[in-house]
Structures are given as structure tokens and as C-alpha cells.
Curated annotation (Swiss-Prot):
Annotated protein name in UniProt: Mannitol-1-phosphate 5-dehydrogenase
Lineage start: Eukaryota, Fungi, Dikarya, Ascomycota, Pezizomycotina
Catalytic function, reaction form: D-mannitol 1-phosphate + NAD(+) = beta-D-fructose 6-phosphate + NADH + H(+)
GO molecular function: mannitol-1-phosphate 5-dehydrogenase activity
Enzyme Commission number, as recorded: 1.1.1.17
BP terms from Gene Ontology: mannitol catabolic process
Positions of the catalytic residues: 211
Name of the coding gene: mpdA
Summary of the function given for this chain in its UniProt record: Catalyzes the NAD(H)-dependent interconversion of D-fructose 6-phosphate and D-mannitol 1-phosphate in the mannitol metabolic pathway.
Length: 386
């Protein structure tokens, strides 16, 4: 039986990655810095995952796990990594830099011949490469090249707002996709982990961009239009014909990029879009627009779900008007209770000039063909609050 270390004991960690590592026969060690969460995991011998679909619900029991607090027990985490088979994480792209030092120490402490598999399960393009970059700053190059295999992945599974008093149990969408590149393992001449839930591919880029620019773009577009319209859930928002039309227009534009760039057929992409719309329309998920819309600063950043596809479309001379509309709605997601980034967004738009705000939020160069169009939308939103 192997051992997996997973950074991030939240709903994605327990309800997606943890589930599939458990089913693959691994003992899972959850690592987090939230004291109450770690204590709860340590004191709870099992938890349930309820998969939700329009056909009903199915419950699974998860066991054979432990938990460690990397803040107070870093040395223990280092020793666990030193003897682990796989390290995964679901902590958010901006937290990767903070987990890198302990992973670096764990690699330095390894004396097993098989390299450690490292997979960052984040909603970001090539997040494992990002994590590797942070680890490289903390240890010698030969430690990384000899003792680890880093593989990027694309993940897709909706984890809605959880009911109160749900404990460690997780309600989660039945549908899932976990695609991981196998090339790094081939290059090292080692076998990839035997996790049946993972779809191993040679070329990951099409999967990452298709997922990010369809699922995440469509989901967030629905949330931002829905928020402005006073809708409570994603399903409610998509029942509004005007919002549904706007979402389809956005996904038509991202589809044109995916088809043009990756050679995916128009019919295949259309079926993928239809499946995504059906999934996020599922009323049984009870997925709140504020949950999906949270962290607007990250979602408006350069390589994310709006500026990412819009910038590439602009560079190719293709249409991006609907994406501009979604960007404008995202700019209006301000001062939402419980979301610090929405408050910071309001502050930036209030205190900075339109040019300063556009550059800070999007990281676009001023001579980029998208820049002036986003600048115009920033000005529009700023003028509304004057």
C-alpha cells in the first residue's frame, strides 16, 4: 500500500483528490495550516462523499487517512514526504509558494530509489510547473531532477456550497475529469502512479485550455451576470434566457480559440460546451453565484479564464466582444461579504486611474490589442460609482 501526501484539507482535497487516492489504495496524509480542520480530520475516522446528479445521489465512505499541521509540525510533514509515493495539492495557485519549502525539505530527506510524483491539482494552467519553480528556489537542481517527477494536470469537478453542520462530509458533482501528462514519467523511465481515476495523456495543453476556457469561463460568466441580476444560484441564473444567451456567446468565442489553436473539431467542442452548460445548470448542486464568483482579482488576471482567452483571440484577430462583457461584469463583483478580493477590487477601482487599474488587474501590456478594449470597460465601471 502506497502513501500520498495531499496539501489542502478542504472540500476539493477531501472530495476529489482524496477520494480517488483512497480508491487507488493509498493511505492519504492531509496537510493544512487550519488548526480546527486538522483536529477535525485527526479525530474523525471516516467521512462521506455524496455524489450528486440528476439521477439521484450516491454516497461513498472514505477511510485510511491521517492529518498533519504543517505550521506546527513541519518536521513531521518533511518525514512523511521523505517516504511518500505521491504529493498532490489543492490549495489555490497563490498558496503554492508557501508549500514549496516543506516539499523541498522532504525531497532533500528522501533516500528511496523511486522518485516522488508531484501533481498540483489547481484551477490554473501548468500549476505543477509553477510549484516546481518555487521548490527550485529552495533546494539544489540535482535534488529535484533525481528525486521527483513533476506532472501538470487539468482537473474538473464542481464542489458547491456545503450544507451547514456537514462536518468533513462533502457533497460533490458526480461528473469529474482528472487529466495528467505522462511524458515526464516516460522521460525518466519510471511508471506513473496507478490511479484509475486519472486519464494519462502525452499532450496536456488542449485539455487544460479547453477546461479552463470552457468550464471555468462559463461558470464565472454565469456567476457575474447572475450576481448583478440578483440570482442566488448558478442554476437560477442559467434559467434566465438573457444570462444563458450571454454565457453561450462567451463560450462561442472561447470555442473559436480552442478550435483554431488546438485543432479540436467544431462538433466535439459543441458537445463539450453543451455538456458543461447542462452540468452547471443542475439545480441539485445548489451552487451559489457568490461562491463561484469569489476571488475576482485572480479570475481577472493575465492567464486566467477571461483575459487568457480574450488576449489570445485579440492576437489572432478573432472576435472577443462577449468576453469583454463578462470582464465588465466581473469588475462589478465588488464588496461581496466574505470575499476579500472583491473588496480589494473595489479599492483598486476607486483609488487608481483607469490605466493603472487595467494594468494592475490584467497585467496586459499597453500595446496589446486587448488592452484598450479592457481599459474602456474599466472606465465604464469606474464612472458608475462616481
Amino acid at each position: 500500500m502506497g502513501k500520498a501526501i495531499h496539501f489542502g484539507g478542504g472540500n476539493i482535497g477531501r472530495g476529489f483528490v482524496g477520494e480517488f487516492l483512497h480508491e487507488a489504495g493509498y493511505e492519504v496524509v492531509f496537510v493544512d495550516v487550519v488548526d480546527d480542520l486538522i483536529t477535525s480530520i485527526q479525530n474523525t475516522p471516516s467521512y462521506e462523499i455524496t455524489e450528486i446528479s440528476e439521477d439521484g445521489e450516491k454516497t461513498k465512505k472514505i477511510t485510511n487517512y491521517r492529518a498533519l499541521n504543517s505550521k506546527s509540525h513541519e518536521a513531521d510533514v518533511v518525514q512523511e514526504i521523505a517516504t511518500a509515493d505521491i504529493v498532490t495539492c489543492a490549495v489555490g495557485p497563490r498558496v503554492l509558494q508557501f508549500i514549496a519549502p516543506v516539499i523541498a525539505k522532504g525531497l532533500e530527506s528522501r533516500n528511496v530509489s523511486t522518485p516522488l510524483t508531484v501533481i498540483a491539482c489547481e484551477n490554473a494552467i501548468n500549476a505543477t510547473d509553477t510549484l516546481r519553480g518555487h521548490i527550485e528556489k529552495k533546494t539544489k537542481p540535482e535534488i529535484i531532477s533525481e528525486r521527483a517527477v513533476f506532472a501538470n494536470c487539468a482537473i474538473d469537478r464542481i464542489v458547491p456550497n456545503q450544507p451547514p453542520n456537514n462536518g468533513l462530509n462533502v457533497r460533490i458533482e458526480k461528473y469529474w475529469e482528472w487529466v495528467v501528462e505522462q511524458t515526464p514519467f516516460k522521460e525518466k523511465g519510471v511508471a506513473h502512479p496507478n490511479v484509475s481515476a486519472i486519464h494519462w495523456v502525452d499532450k496536456l495543453d488542449p485539455y487544460i485550455e479547453r477546461k479552463l476556457f470552457t468550464v471555468n469561463t462559463g461558470h464565472a460568466t454565469t456567476a457575474y451576470y447572475g450576481h448583478l441580476a440578483g440570482k442566488k444560484t448558478i442554476a437560477d441564473a442559467l434559467h434566465d434566457p438573457k444570462i444563458r444567451e450571454n454565457v453561450h456567446k462567451v463560450l462561442d468565442e472561447t470555442a473559436s480559440l480552442i478550435i483554431n489553436k488546438h485543432g479540436i473539431s467544431e462538433q466535439e467542442q459543441k458537445e463539450y460546451v453543451d455538456k458543461i452548460i447542462s452540468r452547471i445548470s443542475n439545480p441539485y448542486l445548489e451552487d451559489g453565484v457568490e461562491r463561484v464568483g469569489r476571488a475576482p482579482l485572480r479570475k481577472l488576471s493575465r492567464n486566467e479564464r477571461f483575459i487568457g482567452p480574450a488576449s489570445q483571440l485579440a492576437e489572432r484577430g478573432l472576435k472577443f466582444d462577449a468576453l469583454l462583457g463578462a470582464i465588465e461584469q466581473a469588475l462589478r463583483f465588488q464588496n461581496v461579504e466574505g470575499d476579500e478580493e472583491s473588496k480589494e477590487l473595489a479599492k483598486i477601482l476607486k483609488e487608481k486611474t483607469a490605466e493603472e487599474a487595467t494594468s494592475e488587474l490584467t497585467e496586459l501590456e499597453k500595446d496589446h490589442p486587448l488592452y484598450s478594449h479592457v481599459l474602456e470597460r474599466v472606465r465604464t465601471v469606474q464612472q458608475e460609482s462616481k
